[in-house]
């Protein structure tokens, strides 16, 4: 009898300890009819991190327990706020789940101060078809709804029925939708990964998954993330099939939790009071030709130099022009919208290299006007950023008809004039970047060591006003 009583006391103590991890649980309707809602679990000791969870179910139903509610204690114990999303089934109305997921992300961010959450540390998690939804929000959503990190369990990634999961494809896109190649490609999220803009991710799946082929789904997403240089990890377990979720009977359950915990511990969110720096530019800012440019391009090096009191983001986009009539205008891209939504405190603009190309410079009369438009958009932001206009670095070779004479005689005088008119800082990269030996073979893009030199020049300019 004493042993039984002792066991009961121990069990009650464990249950009480578990209950302490969650300070508050409640359900919040996202639609007026309650068809979409969030079950919210706020931790006793909040770390500021949050995760919005999208259970799977082939876009026909939701596995709300082992891919939803059962995870609450795991996250709350780490101080992570956890939100299980009940999203509406699409029945061929492919925008419906995305609308619910984006609303959930915005709701969490809008309530950040009340729920003790860092707006810049909100992740998304999804399983199977819910993994497809999570990856869709990660790649297609606008900045305010896009997560800071993604956790994808055995995700459906391809919307091609024979490559992904036929039921998910037909339920999301409909009978006619799966015949529309553009629509299928749009929702095949490995095709929508964007360098610097798609958040870091971890993908977890079993090698023997027979329902959602790993190679054309989870592995394909990882491959694309790695190809563009985004941060991504993958854990493939020997067995487990499809749909193991939080089931403790799965042999690799404890290892999976350990792997996920270590990954979550491997990165920190920016400080809430960090000074936000947006690096706007073309492929030179992007880090074209530098493997893992997200970590080794000039903005990443600038981040290391400035320290954790700053949050530096890379908004470089290859081939883009300042000119709105150029072949690929920067201000028509998601990266530009992201840079504005970031509400930067400091902006570094380095554009003009591609504008010097023969077919773009025919619109030279509008170069100053378009630069002024960009500056005006930034000055109108509530964050009132300090703006630095950079001259392009030298074009050491005339690759792709990029013309250094046009840069020197046509662009730089205009950039200086706009900088003076708007009281912007001017960083003369063209004069200060003299490192022809630190360029790639094309003579246009700096190599890794050249990116370090660029970061040093820009850091020096920013530091003068620190």
What positions do the PLM features span?
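Primarily recognizes the serine-hydrolase "nucleophile elbow" in alpha/beta-hydrolase
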Residues: 103-168, 184-185, 189
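Short beta-strand/loop motif that positions the catalytic acidic residue
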Residues: 202-206
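Conserved alpha/beta-hydrolase "acid-adjacent" motif
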Residues: 210-217
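C-terminal catalytic histidine-bearing segment of alpha/beta-hydrolase fold enzymes
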Residues: 219-271, 441-444, 448, 452, ...
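Catalytic His-Asp segment of secreted/periplasmic serine-dependent ester chemistry enzymes
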Residues: 241-247, 290, 393-466
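Conserved SGNH/GDSL esterase-like catalytic core that processes O-acyl groups on lipids
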Residues: 273-279, 284-372, 406
């Amino acid at each position: 009898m004493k042993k039984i009583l002792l066991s009961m006391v121990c069990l009650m103590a464990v249950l009480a300890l578990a209950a302490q991890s969650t300070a508050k649980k409640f359900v919040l309707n996202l639609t007026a009819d309650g068809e979409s809602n969030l079950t919210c679990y706020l931790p006793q000791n909040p770390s500021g991190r949050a995760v919005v969870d999208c259970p799977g179910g082939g876009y026909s139903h939701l596995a709300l327990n082992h891919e939803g509610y059962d995870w609450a204690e795991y996250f709350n114990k780490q101080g992570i706020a956890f939100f299980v999303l009940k999203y509406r089934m699409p029945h061929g109305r492919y925008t419906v789940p995305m609308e619910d997921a984006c609303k959930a992300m915005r709701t969490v961010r809008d309530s950040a101060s009340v729920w003790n959450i860092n707006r810049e540390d909100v992740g998304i998690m999804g399983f199977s078809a819910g993994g497809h939804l999570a990856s869709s929000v990660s790649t297609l959503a606008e900045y305010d709804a896009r997560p800071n990190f993604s956790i994808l369990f055995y995700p459906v990634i391809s919307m091609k029925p024979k490559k992904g999961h036929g039921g998910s494809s037909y339920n999301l896109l409909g009978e006619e939708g799966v015949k529309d190649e553009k629509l299928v490609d749009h929702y095949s999220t490995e095709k929508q990964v964007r360098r610097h803009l798609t958040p870091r991710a971890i993908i977890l799946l079993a090698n023997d998954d027979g329902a959602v082929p790993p190679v054309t789904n989870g592995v394909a997403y990882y491959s694309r993330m790695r190809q563009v240089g985004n941060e991504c990890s993958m854990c493939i377990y020997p067995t487990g099939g499809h749909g193991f979720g939080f089931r403790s009977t799965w042999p690799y359950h404890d290892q999976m939790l350990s792997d996920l915990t270590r990954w979550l511990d491997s990165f920190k969110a920016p400080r809430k009071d960090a000074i936000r720096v947006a690096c706007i530019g073309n492929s030179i800012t992007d880090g074209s030709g530098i493997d893992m440019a997200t970590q080794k391009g000039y903005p990443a090096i600038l981040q290391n130099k400035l320290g954790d009191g700053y949050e530096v983001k890379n908004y470089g986009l290859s081939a883009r022009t300042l000119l709105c009539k150029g072949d690929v205008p920067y201000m028509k891209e998601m990266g530009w919208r992201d840079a504005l939504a970031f509400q930067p405190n400091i902006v570094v603009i380095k554009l003009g290299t591609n504008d010097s190309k023969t077919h773009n410079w025919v619109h030279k009369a509008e170069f100053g006007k378009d630069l002024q438009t960009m500056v005006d958009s930034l000055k109108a932001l509530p964050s009132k950023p300090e703006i630095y206009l950079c001259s392009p670095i030298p074009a050491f070779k005339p690759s792709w008809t990029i013309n250094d004479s046009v840069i020197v005689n046509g662009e730089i005088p205009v950039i200086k004039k706009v900088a003076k008119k708007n009281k912007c800082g001017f960083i003369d990269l063209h004069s200060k970047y003299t490192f022809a030996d630190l360029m790639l073979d094309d003579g246009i893009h700096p190599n890794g060591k050249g990116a370090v030199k660029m970061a040093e020049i820009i850091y020096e300019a920013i530091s003068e006003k620190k």
